[in-house]
């Protein structure tokens, strides 16, 4: 309805997590000429989403169907598979792992807007920037590198999926670096209950009640600790 009858030429996915890509197959049923851009590591899981659904179900449990509905496969012939480093028309593509091993970001040349997906963090209204860290691919070192990579574009604005566009690009990049260090260290040194309590407390300290509620709905704290726990477990052997 928001498109007001306009038909998109493509869906440019930053990554295939279900809150970003779960409805892609269903959307294509309405737009038969629309193509999908996706990183090569994510493409197989759009064609056959069974592992994607299973992974998300481990996080959301009995709420999976209520939250996300049916995840419809994407026909392979509708995909444009990316590796990073491409320039496609007005768009520059970079591989930006850290949040996900199949994450890419896009720079739109004419507008100088960078579409950074979850690499730019979660920022709602005047609230803080929090790194979204669900399992299984969190890699803090790669994430820091990806933040620097998209910051190096010199974009005028970052478009962050959760939620909005922001023109304080340098400050946002710095907030992400600080957030990755702070919350990564907390997850290393504490347990899930303490981590979740601190996330909620941070939101309440720095955001108004409406912003806090929006954040808790968009990025439930129970989804954040497991990704960092897995990261530290793998790193520490």
Question: What is the predicted function of each stretch?
Answer:
Residues 1-11:
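Pre-active-site segment of Zn-dependent metallo-hydrolases
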Residues 9-19, 46-95, 101-170:
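Metallo-beta-lactamase
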Residues 15, 36, 56, 96, ...:
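Divalent metal-coordination and catalytic microenvironments
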Residues 22-31:
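Metal-dependent catalytic neighborhoods of phosphoester/phosphodiester hydrolases
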Residues 169-178:
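Histidine/acidic-residue-rich catalytic or RNA/ligand-binding cores of hydrolases
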Residues 186-237:
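C-terminal regulatory/interaction regions
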């Amino acid at each position: 309805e928001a498109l007001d009858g306009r038909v998109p030429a493509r869906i440019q996915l930053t990554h295939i997590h279900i809150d970003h890509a779960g409805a892609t197959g269903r959307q294509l049923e309405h737009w038969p000429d629309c193509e999908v851009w996706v990183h090569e590591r994510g493409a197989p899981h759009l064609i056959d989403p069974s592992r994607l659904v299973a992974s998300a179900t481990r996080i959301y449990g009995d709420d999976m169907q209520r939250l996300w509905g049916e995840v419809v496969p994407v026909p392979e012939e509708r995909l444009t598979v990316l590796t990073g480093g491409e320039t496609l028309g007005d768009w520059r593509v970079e591989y930006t792992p850290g949040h996900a091993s199949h994450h890419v970001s896009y720079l739109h040349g004419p507008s100088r807007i960078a579409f950074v997906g979850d690499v730019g963090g979660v920022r709602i209204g005047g609230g803080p920037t929090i790194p979204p860290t669900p399992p299984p691919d969190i890699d803090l070192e790669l994430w820091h590198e990806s933040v620097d990579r998209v910051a190096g574009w010199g974009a005028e604005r970052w478009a962050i999926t959760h939620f909005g566009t922001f023109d304080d690009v340098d400050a946002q990049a710095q907030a992400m670096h600080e957030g990755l260090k702070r919350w990564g260290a907390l997850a290393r040194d504490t347990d899930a209950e303490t981590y979740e309590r601190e996330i909620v407390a941070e939101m309440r300290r720095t955001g108004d009640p409406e912003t806090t509620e929006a954040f808790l709905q968009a990025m439930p704290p129970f989804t954040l600790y497991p990704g960092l726990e897995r990261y530290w477990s793998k790193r520490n052997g």
